[in-house]
Amino acid sequence: EDINLKYNSKVWTIHPSDIDFRYKVKEATNKALSYTRTAKKLENLKRKSKLILNERHHIALEATYDKDKLDVIIDCIAQQIDREALSATLAIENDGSFKKLPSKDGKELQKDEIKKEIDDIIKNKNIMDLNLPVKTTIPKLKTEDVESVNSILGQFSTAFNNETSRGSNIHVAGESSSDIIIMPQETYSYNNATGPRVLSKGYKYAPVIVGGKYINGEGGGVCQVSTTIYNAALLAGLEIVEVHNHTYLSHYVSGGRDATVAYGYYDLKFKNPYSHPIYIKNIVGDGAITTKIYGCKDDIKRIYVRTEYEYKKQKIIVKTYRVYLDQNNQKIKEELISTNKYDQK
């Protein structure tokens, strides 16, 4: 008997021959013949007596089929049903305009579940039509998530000399660490965003600090990009997970506001603490880089950053605080973000 599998208006029919379906007639016959042929004579006499007295002994007629062939059939059906969930897309242009495309739910045939149902009806000799169990899969980024990104939570700019190899590196790093969506409770990693800053990725040799000395190294200048992103993250109220200061004070930002990076060693990481996604946007122009962090307008905070300097013989110690204000610009709370120690030149 055929097994019909249904989903919406489609029907897939499994014929017995498709899966080598058969009843184990020979096995059942052998069991019947051996019922009174055990190794124990007394037991054989008892069983024969019961049969003579019309006491029936039931021997189940079992069914069997090729599970590998069923797997192939179910896989083929899944290929016709399954559809990958598509996340909504979001792109923010340099002029602040939004480009959004809606998400699409996916479909996934629950293969193990339908194979078990088929196995059950075959074993129970209760062949019937079955509705295919299909699960709706949800994309990571839904339409409503994208729609919630509508405002700037924080932004920051720094200036640089565009006519240098260092300036070229800022352009490359700025592009690779931009246009990234961070979901709620996810952590942004600058090193993960840019990958290794090496020549094969378009970086050039430029001054870097190694062991307290300036030398030419691959990707010199990328710390200005991480620093710009860091300050935007501070003003956006994001949770700072990892940040490191330079050996010396930087020329492009005040003390306690820098974020040095070294691939495989030092990273800039921050977490999205909100219930809506955020979007990291870098705009690298001629002589300036601006980071804008977009999110839901409900998550906008009034924030400013302040620093405290302490000068010692060979060190400059700078404490960085983030201050939250209410609608009347009155301080709600203040948190220490980092304590930074710089060598004096």
Functional labels for PLM-detected ranges:
Residues V72, C76, E84-E93, D105-G106, ...:
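Well-ordered beta-sheet/strand-loop patches within structured domains
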